[in-house]
Structure formats: structure tokens, C-alpha cells
């Protein structure tokens, strides 16, 4: 805070000493005749003024203010600035345009000013303010920006010392936690013979003395009766060596808890036997669904996640000596009009797993009738409460009891997870995948403009409730939480915002909350592997791929014939929507002669016939694709496939393009993570991807791929053209970037690492929730009221 005040003090003193220059700057900004200015617009205007009239401004204290300014709002008298001097730290200032008087203001005052400008009316007398700050004053929070997203490490450090103090006073919460574990009728860990911490220490010593003389590979079953007499039940390990190691970890914790020992010990406790994963919207299935509206990376993510989690759960249970089959159920929507998919089947086993399945429950209208057709993710809010109630009943029957962990996905799944977890009293994990608020400019401030199509008033309210209800939140990248030095994170954008006429958020989500953890996913290693791994290649698919890419015949699901098939291929695959920016890529390609000469463009996206799409935005993008291909005569250089590729075929397609020394491009305006980026890199395909979102962290620019700025398409096209030129002229360059991508994925982005971390996190948060009362009951009551008075009426109104 002192640094922030020093920053403002220096600027104030500069203004006083250089009033003409300061007035020139403010006049220049106000002359743009814009009530709201984005960071990029402010920086561009400042640079333009410095270059043209005021070079002395470049190194002035005002430059420091401008460089950390995220947005500005102004009327004829005042300019209000939102400053972000460092990551997740905000300061609000207003400056009078004539007198140059400046002062620090509150977040509420800043938001109120924006509301007045947006609504074009005078200030409302009373506005509902959403403020969770009073509920978190005494709760542990991170302070350093580099600690954000490492919540469990922070919790372990802070709370392990607290646990040590409480154990010294005879506290029994750790003991009670160890005694509470059961699997149906099977008692685990400790029995009634151990009554207090003193008994626990004594029993651990006796058991260790007994086990010391036993063969280290002797199984749990062979020593069970002896250990039971000391007070121990199954769950300590599958053989003597592991049992002793687990007991030693607990003895160390009882002696002096350390964060690492605590994490190692908790990661072994048999707490997670069943999972519920919630993903209501879209066509959730295993075949013929990818590329359909609202159906893409999230489905792939969850199916790969399930296979990795089930394997990790099975391995951990076996290591702890328990012959228990874990259960994972994905709860999604049943769609009677399934369009040839399995989405009309109530139960569907998940391929590649032992005991995971998809459970589908229909949406119903207020009269109880089943909704038969697909519904956009933006239109499903009226159905979620009833879906949560019916889904909970079906889930409990399917699992023969409560799940041990519930994982929500996207805004709808996270809201349903919140409703269920509160009723069932189980640990809740949220995964956003994408937060719509940051995708659409001023989507909060001008929410009425988008309400008919997107219903953001419901979605942003659901996000606020679910974020603050969750026990822990996992993200794929740091910037998903807290952005970069230059821009705010997706979650950070929910810390303060306003929806005029509804409510004003002055303290929404706090990115310094230890509930945030970065756990990056990977690509399915059975499907996405290096093109150079010849023994595993699916060569029987190559004729089908060659036909898809090069066949001269045209069908209803493809357009364009590549007249120079020997050229390398620039490949992209994504949904056909505005944010994915497929048509933007086509325009870049069309306008870059060098790129067109060096490479063909292959696009797998959407439908060729717009009449086949049920999504208005997709139809609009399809029509634009046809217009661009006609306008720029691209049919000989661009191949557009409106097909849905199964995973095995998609994996081999990546490798086929790598064989031909091609590249992959992900041109999205914003990408929360970038699963296709991981898939391409895992296949050894050099990758270009947007600098907005997850790919900025995934790719090391120039080493394991390349960043492109989708707002500067000409530069992006030039970069891709330069790459293909360099590959043609410099031996080994293509292989250098290809290997860099493979190395990066192996080091950071695998499902094995993901599953290990996810299972450890679920245990640690479950433990701290039990022993430290992390339920935040006061906050939950506040959120329940907000749900009942704000979300519920608006959702119900949609159904009328």
C-alpha cells in the first residue's frame, strides 16, 4: 500500500509542477470522446502524445500511472482511473479535468461512476452491494503474487504449526479425523482401542516394534490381527514396509508437524472411493459429439481426467492394502433428441475404465415435462435447480451412498455442485474451463445488451456463488487466476465489477484465497504421442486421412481441393464460433501471399452447410467462411472439413501433418487453457497459439512453439510465413521446434501428474475442512440468501 501511495504522490507532485503538460494529457484523452477507455487504448493514446507533442512525458511519474492503468472512465469533469500497480492489487483514483485535483477513491465510488455513465442517468439512491470482505477478515490469505495458485502449500505451512500447538494441548481433532474413515461397513485406520493422542503414540510405537522383526514384503492380511489389537484397521499399507513408512510419517507429525510430512501422510489416507463429476450442458458422450454446439474441449478434458483419476485411485487404494474398486460417475443431461449420439441413454460405461460411467438425467420444464431437444449453455439456467435435486437422488442410488468428492465443470456444473455439496456435506472442487465474463467486452457493465442471447446476469451470479462455495478451485494456468503484470486474470475480474440495475460487487472472489491451485492437464498419452514413435502409429488410418485431406471429390462435409498437395500443411481444429476465431485465421492467411505460397491451410471445424447447425453464432461464422473463400479464391489452397473426428483419427492426423513438416495454429481471441495446443505439441507438431490465455504459459516462445497476437493478424501471418521459410532454408529447424514442444509437454503437462496432484489436494482440503472448520458457514449463509433472492428469480423468469 505504501508503494501505491508513493506512486500516486509522485504523480500528484509532477502534476503540480507541470500543470500544462498534465492538462495536455488529460485533454488528449478526453478529446477521444469516449466514456470508457481500455488499457490498450490508453497506452496507444499516451504513446501517440509522447511521440507527437510531449516526449518528456515518457519518463515522468505520469507514465508510471498510465503503465499500470487497466481502464479509465470519464465525463466532462472527471477522469476515473483503475490502477493495478502489481498483480491482484488495485488502486482507484480520480482527477478533475480542469483543476487537476486528484484523490484516491473507493472501489464502490469507482463502480458507481461507471454505472452512472453506462446507464446515462443520475446515481441511484440505493444499490445492492455484494461484499464478502467481512467474512474473511480472520481467515488465512496469501500475500505474495508468486504464491497465488499454490493454496495447498500455503495452508499446510500455516496450519501445520497451528496443529502442533493444538496437539501439545491434547487436541483430539487429528485423532477424530483418523477414526472417522470408513468404507461402507469397513472401519479404516483406527478403531475404538485408541482413545486419545497418548494412546495413539503408544500404539504406533508398539506396532512399529512388532513390524520391525517381520519381513518387509509381508502383506497386510498376514499382520492384520496383530495390528488390530494395537488399534489399527486397514488403510495403512499393503505390506509391512509401506505400513511402517505411513506410521513413521504420523509419528513425525505428532512430534512436530511439517508441511511436507503432512502432505505425504494425508496423500495416503483412504478418503476418496467415489467421485461425482458434473457437466450438465452440451452433448456429453464418447462418440459423434465433438464439434457439436457447446461440445468440445471440456468433454475431452473430463473423459481423459476420469481415466487418469480412476487409475490413480486404484493404485492408491491397492498401495494402502484395500481391495476396493473406486467409482466415478459423470452426471450430465439426458437429451431425448440425441441426433445419433448416445445422449439419450441413461447410463453409459466409459471406455478405457474399470468402473466409471456417464449418468444422464433430463431437464424438465416447470410442469415436469422432459425437455427433448438440445439447449444452449446460455439458456439452461431455469432447469438447473430441479436437475440438481433429481440428479442428486439418481447419483446416491448409483453410488449406493454419497460421493467423497464432487467436481463441478463450467458455470452450470459448478452451480449444481454447490447446491449438491451443501446438502450432502461433501468436499467440492470447481473447474471453470472458461469464464465468459472476460470473453465479451464490458459484458458486466452493459449486460442488458447481451441478456436476450447470453443471459449473463444469471451466469455471472452463478459464478460468484459457486466460486465462493467451493472448497478448492483448480485452474490450468496462473493467469487464469491472476493474469499477468499487464492484465487482470479471469478469476480476478470477479473481484470487483458492476451490473447496473442488479448489483455491485465490491469484494467478490479473492485470488489470494488459498482455495486456488494450479493443476495443469495433459493429452491422452495413448492417443497423442510423437510422430516419430513409428511402432505405435495407426498406419491403417492413413488412407482415410489422405482421402480426407487430399481427395479431389467434393462432398457435403468438405470444401476446397488442395492443388499443390506437396506443400506443408498449416492445421487448425476448433469449434466454429467467434472466440475460436477460425474465420480470422482464414482472413490472415488469405491476405498473406508468402504464407499462401509456403503452406496449405487445413481446417476441421463446424459444418459446411449452415442449415445443419442449430447454433446462431456458428451459422454466422460458417457463412463468413464461405464468403472469405469466395472473395479470396481460396479453394485451391484451403481444405475445410466439416466433420467430427474421433480421437484416434485426430491423433493420427496430427502426426500425418507432422510427417509432412507442417504446423498447428490455435488463433483464438482468448483460450482459457488450450487442450488442442497440448495435443499438437504431444504429437511433435510445431505450434502457434494465441497469447491471450493458457497458451502463453504452455508455450515458451521460440523454443517450444510460438505466441501469436490475434488482434494483430498481419503480424501473426508473417510469423507463420517466416517459420515455413526458415524450415525450408535451414535444416533441422523444424525438428528443433518439434522437439522443444515434446520436451515441454513431458515436463509439465501429463495426466499422470494431474491425477496425482488432484487426489492429494482432495485429501488435504478434506482434512483441513474437518480439523479447522473451513466450511465458512457465515459465508455460505450469505451466498444462500444471494442465490434465493438474486439468482433464483431471474432463472425462473427465463422459463416464463
Predicted regions and their residues:
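Catalytic cores of nucleotide-sugar-dependent glycosyltransferases that transfer UDP/GDP/TDP-activated
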Residues: 1-800
Amino acid at each position: 500500500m505504501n508503494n501505491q501511495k508513493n506512486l500516486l504522490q509522485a504523480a500528484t507532485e509532477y502534476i503540480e509542477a507541470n500543470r500544462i503538460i498534465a492538462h495536455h494529457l488529460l485533454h488528449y484523452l478526453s478529446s477521444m470522446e469516449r466514456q470508457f477507455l481500455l488499457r490498450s487504448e490508453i497506452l496507444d493514446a499516451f504513446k501517440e502524445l509522447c511521440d507527437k507533442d510531449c516526449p518528456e512525458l515518457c519518463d515522468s511519474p505520469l507514465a508510471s500511472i498510465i503503465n499500470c492503468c487497466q481502464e479509465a472512465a470519464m465525463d466532462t469533469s472527471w477522469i476515473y482511473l483503475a490502477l493495478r500497480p502489481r498483480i491482484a492489487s488495485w488502486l482507484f483514483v480520480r482527477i478533475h479535468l480542469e483543476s487537476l485535483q486528484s484523490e484516491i477513491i473507493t472501489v464502490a465510488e469507482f463502480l458507481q461512476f461507471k454505472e452512472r455513465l453506462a446507464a446515462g442517468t443520475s446515481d441511484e439512491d440505493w444499490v445492492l452491494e455484494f461484499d464478502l470482505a467481512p467474512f474473511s477478515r480472520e481467515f488465512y490469505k496469501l500475500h505474495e503474487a508468486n504464491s497465488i495458485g499454490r493454496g495447498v502449500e500455503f495452508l499446510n505451512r500455516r496450519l501445520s504449526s497451528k496443529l502442533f500447538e493444538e496437539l501439545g494441548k491434547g487436541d483430539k481433532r487429528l485423532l477424530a479425523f483418523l477414526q472417522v474413515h470408513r468404507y461402507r461397513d469397513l472401519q479404516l485406520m483406527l478403531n475404538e482401542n485408541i482413545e486419545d493422542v497418548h494412546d495413539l503414540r503408544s500404539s504406533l510405537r508398539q506396532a512399529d516394534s512388532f513390524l520391525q522383526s517381520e519381513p518387509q514384503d509381508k502383506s497386510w492380511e498376514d499382520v492384520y490381527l496383530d495390528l488390530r489389537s494395537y488399534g489399527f484397521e486397514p488403510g495403512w499399507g499393503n505390506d509391512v514396509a509401506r505400513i511402517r513408512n505411513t506410521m513413521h510419517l504420523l509419528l513425525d507429525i505428532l512430534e512436530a508437524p511439517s508441511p511436507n510430512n503432512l502432505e505425504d501422510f494425508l496423500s495416503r489416507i483412504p478418503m476418496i472411493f467415489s467421485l461425482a463429476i458434473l457437466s450438465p450442458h452440451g452433448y456429453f458422450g464418447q462418440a459423434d459429439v465433438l464439434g457439436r454446439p457447446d461440445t468440445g474441449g471440456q468433454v475431452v478434458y473430463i473423459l481423459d481426467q476420469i481415466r487418469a483419476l480412476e487409475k490413480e485411485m486404484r493404485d492408491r487404494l491397492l498401495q494402502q492394502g484395500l481391495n476396493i474398486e473406486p467409482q466415478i460417475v459423470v452426471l450430465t443431461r439426458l437429451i431425448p433428441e440425441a441426433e445419433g449420439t448416445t445422449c439419450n441413454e441413461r447410463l453409459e460405461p466409459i471406455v478405457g475404465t474399470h468402473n466409471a460411467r456417464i449418468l444422464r438425467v433430463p431437464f424438465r420444464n416447470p410442469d415436469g415435462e422432459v425437455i427433448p431437444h438440445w439447449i444452449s449453455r446460455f439458456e439452461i439456467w431455469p432447469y438447473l435447480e430441479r436437475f440438481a435435486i433429481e440428479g442428486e437422488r439418481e447419483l446416491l442410488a448409483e453410488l449406493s451412498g454419497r460421493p467423497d468428492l464432487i467436481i463441478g465443470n463450467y458455470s452450470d456444473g459448478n452451480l449444481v455442485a454447490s447446491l449438491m455439496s451443501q446438502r450432502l456435506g461433501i468436499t467440492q472442487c470447481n473447474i471453470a474451463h472458461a469464464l465468459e465474463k472476460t470473453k465479451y467486452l464490458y459484458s458486466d457493465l452493459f449486460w442488458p445488451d447481451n441478456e436476450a442471447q447470453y443471459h449473463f446476469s444469471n451466469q455471472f451470479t452463478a459464478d460468484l456463488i459457486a466460486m465462493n462455495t467451493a472448497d478448492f478451485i483448480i485452474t490450468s494456468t496462473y493467469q487464469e487466476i491472476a493474469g499477468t503484470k499487464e492484465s487482470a486474470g479471469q478469476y480476478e475480474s470477479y473481484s470487483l465489477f458492476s451490473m447496473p440495475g442488479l448489483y455491485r460487487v465490491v469484494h467478490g472472489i479473492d485470488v489470494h484465497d488459498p482455495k486456488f491451485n494450479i493443476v495443469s492437464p495433459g493429452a491422452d498419452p495413448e492417443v497423442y504421442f510423437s510422430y516419430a514413435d513409428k511402432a505405435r502409429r495407426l498406419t491403417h488410418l492413413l488412407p482415410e486421412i489422405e482421402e480426407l485431406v487430399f481427395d479431389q471429390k467434393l462432398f457435403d462435409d468438405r470444401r476446397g481441393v488442395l492443388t499443390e498437395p506437396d506443400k506443408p500443411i498449416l492445421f487448425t481444429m476448433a469449434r466454429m464460433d467467434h472466440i475460436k476465431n477460425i474465420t480470422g485465421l482464414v482472413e490472415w492467411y488469405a491476405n498473406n501471399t508468402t504464407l499462401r505460397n509456403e503452406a496449405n491451410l487445413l481446417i476441421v471445424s463446424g459444418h459446411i452447410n449452415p442449415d445443419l447447425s442449430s447454433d446462431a453464432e456458428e451459422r454466422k461464422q460458417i457463412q463468413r467462411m464461405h464468403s472469405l473463400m469466395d472473395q479470396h479464391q481460396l479453394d485451391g489452397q484451403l481444405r475445410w472439413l466439416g466433420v467430427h473426428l474421433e480421437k484416434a483419427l485426430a491423433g493420427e492426423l496430427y502426426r500425418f501433418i507432422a510427417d509432412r513438416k507442417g504446423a498447428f495454429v490455435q488463433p483464438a481471441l482468448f483460450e482459457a487453457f488450450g487442450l488442442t495446443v497440448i495435443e499438437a505439441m504431444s504429437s511433435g507438431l510445431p505450434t502457434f497459439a494465441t497469447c491471450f490465455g493458457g497458451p502463453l504459459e504452455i508455450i515458451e516462445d521460440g523454443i517450444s512453439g510460438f505466441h501469436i497476437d490475434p488482434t494483430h493478424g498481419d503480424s501473426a501471418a508473417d510469423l507463420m510465413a517466416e517459420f515455413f521459410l526458415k524450415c525450408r532454408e535451414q535444416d533441422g529447424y523444424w525438428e528443433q521446434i518439434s522437439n522443444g514442444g515434446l520436451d515441454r509437454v513431458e515436463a509439465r503437462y501429463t495426466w499422470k501428474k494431474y491425477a496425482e496432484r488432484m487426489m492429494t489436494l482432495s485429501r488435504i482440503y478434506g482434512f483441513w475442512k474437518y480439523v479447522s472448520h473451513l466450511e465458512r458457514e457465515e459465508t455460505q449463509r450469505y451466498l444462500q440468501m444471494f442465490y434465493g433472492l438474486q439468482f433464483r428469480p431471474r432463472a425462473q423468469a427465463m422459463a416464463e
